[in-house]
């Protein structure tokens, strides 16, 4: 957005994760977080009559004063923390809340600044609780307060570090369980006696610039929401082109200027009725930020996007922040990242800048969604065969052959045995057709320019047999919505990405990559000197290389799924 641009930023692209600005340092471990623990200071010691109150709450895993009284998932960590401190109070000393406790309460009350709901951390309740502590509270009251703050702190710290929802609930192969923080140890060493507890907790957040940029735009869009009066732009049945009248010109100008697609210094005619000039340029800018070709025309899709309430954009930002927290905080090598809703792949430099980005085609939204996971690129195959999958062979190839026995020859396929022996690359007999149907014989497409994989594929072994590859239909990249594949990811101009992937292999520059793709040697496998992480992620809100926020359609419905999961689960 123009009024938000200060300087270019680097980005990977995750959301509702999108991966931008990833830290590439390796070897992060939890002990590093605790390398310099703060010296311990004792909290208030309980009397013999107060101890049972503490043990009762801790042992039961329940504090009735919490919005979510049951804290069973945190019970072990809570017990460990109090045992470490001799069953003394942690946040209260001499009947008063210690500075560290007040600092943590401030974070809980302002959890919305991180895209979280303060209600989940008793945010609105802390003011009254603090007031009650000024009124000669009983020891039981102090115990209830102290344990409530301990539980709420843990409930806040965990999602800040690795997200509220486990991505495996959606069958995404992203490991947040391996990122789980030893909460008792962290609070003991880094929070209870820290000079700046908020700074210690902030270290747990994703270290990526893209995450921070998106987080910074959250209050901006919340400001837009406060200005929104609910009025909509007039819908259209026919596309409005530059120079034509449009009933919503004044409203359109106000909106585009408010959100920064028209620069603040541009003067607009408050009585205009013709769609032209700065409005057209503003619409182009808006279209580009919302996954549309920037035509400048007001068609039904563009009007629908313009009428999307700010609250929806805020939700997209929050869902993407959640997905950011699912990702590893560091990588052994600069990664390759595919953001599905954006239809884009990025490769990163060691310093975190974007080495290159390319448009991609992803799996069909209905029936062939591309998976979400983290894997490692192991090798590249030049001029590959396309080994037709069993489902495509049975459900698509067989019907084609039944209609036309010469289908195999026309499309450069061949039928082979499990050992790779060619049975036919011409007309298919009934016996061979039965072998194809029963999967006793396999169908593959010969290498070459007409191969569906194009002239190269990038392999990262995975159960879904998904990989990055070229295409024999580059014209499809001109489409705004590009979910055309059976799950694999087609890359525009793949030679550039392949050269980047092979950059550490001696002798493999762009010219050699191009020559090999157009050479005569088929199915040539080149193993990588060092494996490269690859992430396939899903973020419907991102900040791009030009430092502009962009929003994309929820092509797979994963934003809706995550929204439901967050609504039904408490922290």
Q: For each predicted feature, which ranges?
A:
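Bacterial N-terminal signal peptides that target proteins for export
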Residues: 2-14
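Bacterial N-terminal signal peptides
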Residues: 13-23
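N-terminal, post-signal-peptide region of Sec/Tat-exported proteins
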Residues: 68-116
């Amino acid at each position: 957005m123009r009024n938000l641009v200060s300087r270019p930023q680097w980005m990977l692209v995750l959301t509702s994760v999108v991966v931008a600005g990833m830290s590439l340092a390796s070897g992060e471990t939890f002990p590093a977080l605790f390398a310099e623990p703060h010296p311990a200071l004792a909290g208030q010691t309980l009397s013999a009559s107060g101890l049972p109150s503490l043990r009762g709450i801790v042992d039961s895993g329940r504090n009735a004063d919490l919005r979510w009284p049951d804290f069973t998932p945190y019970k072990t960590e809570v017990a460990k923390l109090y045992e470490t401190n001799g069953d003394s109070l942690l946040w209260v000393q001499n009947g008063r809340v210690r500075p560290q406790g007040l600092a943590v309460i401030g974070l809980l009350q302002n959890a919305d600044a991180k895209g979280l709901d303060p209600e989940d951390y008793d945010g609105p309740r802390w003011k009254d609780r603090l007031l009650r502590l000024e009124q000669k509270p009983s020891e039981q009251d102090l115990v209830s307060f102290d344990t409530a703050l301990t539980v709420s702190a843990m409930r806040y710290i965990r999602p800040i570090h690795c997200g509220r929802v486990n991505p495996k609930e959606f069958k995404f192969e992203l490991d947040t369980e391996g990122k789980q923080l030893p909460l008792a140890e962290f609070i003991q060493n880094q929070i209870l006696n820290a000079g700046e507890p908020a700074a210690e907790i902030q270290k747990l957040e994703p270290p990526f610039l893209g995450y921070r940029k998106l987080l910074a735009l959250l209050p901006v869009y919340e400001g837009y929401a406060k200005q929104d009066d609910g009025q909509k732009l007039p819908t259209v049945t026919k596309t409005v082109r530059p120079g034509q009248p449009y009933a919503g010109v004044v409203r359109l100008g106000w909106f585009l200027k408010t959100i920064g697609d028209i620069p603040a210094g541009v003067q607009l005619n408050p009585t205009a009725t013709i769609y032209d000039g700065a409005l057209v340029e503003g619409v182009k800018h808006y279209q580009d930020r919302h996954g549309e070709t920037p035509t400048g025309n007001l068609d039904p899709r563009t009007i629908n996007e313009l009428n999307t309430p700010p609250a929806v954009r805020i939700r997209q930002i929050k869902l993407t922040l959640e997905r950011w927290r699912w990702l590893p905080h560091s990588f052994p090598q600069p990664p390759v990242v595919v953001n599905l809703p954006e239809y884009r792949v990025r490769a990163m430099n060691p310093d975190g800048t974007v080495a290159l980005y390319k448009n991609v085609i992803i799996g069909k939204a209905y029936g062939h969604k591309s998976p979400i996971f983290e894997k490692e690129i192991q090798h590249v195959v030049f001029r590959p065969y396309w080994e037709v999958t069993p489902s495509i062979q049975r459900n698509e190839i067989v019907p084609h052959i039944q209609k036309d026995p010469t289908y195999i020859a026309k499309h450069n396929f061949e039928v082979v045995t499990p050992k790779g022996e060619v049975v036919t690359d011409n007309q298919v007999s009934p016996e061979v057709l039965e072998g194809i149907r029963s999967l006793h014989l396999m169908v593959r497409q010969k290498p070459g320019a007409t191969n569906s994989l194009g002239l190269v594929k990038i392999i990262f072994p995975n159960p879904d047999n998904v990989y990055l590859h070229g295409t024999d239909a580059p014209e499809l990249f001109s489409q705004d919505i590009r979910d055309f594949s059976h799950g694999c990811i087609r890359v525009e101009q793949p030679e550039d990405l392949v050269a980047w992937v092979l950059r550490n292999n001696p002798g493999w520059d762009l010219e050699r990559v191009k020559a090999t793709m157009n050479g005569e040697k088929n199915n040539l496998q080149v193993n990588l000197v060092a494996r490269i992480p690859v992430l396939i992620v899903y973020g419907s809100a991102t900040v791009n290389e030009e430092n502009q926020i962009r929003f994309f359609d929820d092509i797979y419905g994963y934003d809706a799924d995550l929204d439901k999961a967050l609504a039904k689960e408490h922290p």
